[in-house]
Amino acid sequence: VEIKNEKDEFIIAQNDEKQLLVKGYEDLPVGTYEIESLTGELSSLTASREISSDSVNLDDYGLDKPRATAEVTYHDDSKITFELGNDASGDAGCYVRIDKKGPIYVVNSYFAEQLLKESVMYIGTSLITPPEARKDDTSSGTGGNDTAVMKNMKLSGTVRKEPLEFGVNTRTDDSVYSTFNYLITSPLLKGTGDSAANIAQSATSLDAVRAVKAHPTAAQLKEYGLDKPYSVCELTLAVQTFTSTDDDETVTTYYNSTKHIIKLGKKDKDGNYYALVDDYNAVYLLSSGSVPWAETQFNDIVTPLLFLRDITTVKSIEVN
């Protein structure tokens, strides 16, 4: 498929693995759903009615200067050109001409939406997925309860005076820290409150709103505020599993660790962050809800407890 519209011009074709993708974006995730939606429309388009059997009065339908064209080559090597005109009156759809000098039809508005998309809309948006548990994880003795978790997170960026790091509590034998699921390890060793757990639970996967710019230049990164990121998250995920010893003690171990880095820049008008994720050479938009750590500071996640030691009794009280 070769598409030309008011904003972009690009080709969607099969790669060596017979997967459809935008030419030039071979190094980026593939927006499979969007591509299938486009090709589905192009392979089985149904018109609501025919307006004209010949190509006369094209300017009445906006087809003298089409908003978009799609040149499609099918598996049998046959070719068809679709030209998109104006929206039809009465919200009935849009005008489309099939091949030069061919008939003019009214088709659904969804078809117009597909042809007017920019190439970046066909870049995949699933950026981080949870590490997979072993298929035979029942062998751990947990009954198949191996779970993907956030193991460690380091936060930096211009929004913070110094890095903030926290992760899964590995000091459970220490009575001072044994009650915490997560511990702050930098800049101080402290227990965490509920907000740390909420951040950790949301960190095992990440989906973007959409891609904004493929293969950005240094100047474009600066435009999005990504030359000096506002907030940076260095993230380690892993599958957590529990095993029992001969003494009936539970031992926690981890496997299939994956590391990720997310850099946030400026916000768009809707409050989404421009972002770089891992080694993907593209700028994405991330909703603020998908990155709850974006502005998190030490005081936001530290435990509100004044005393970390497990004080269970009071020896005496003196009041003057």
Label every PLM stretch briefly.
Residues V1-N320:
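Soluble, acidic/polar mature domains that operate outside membranes
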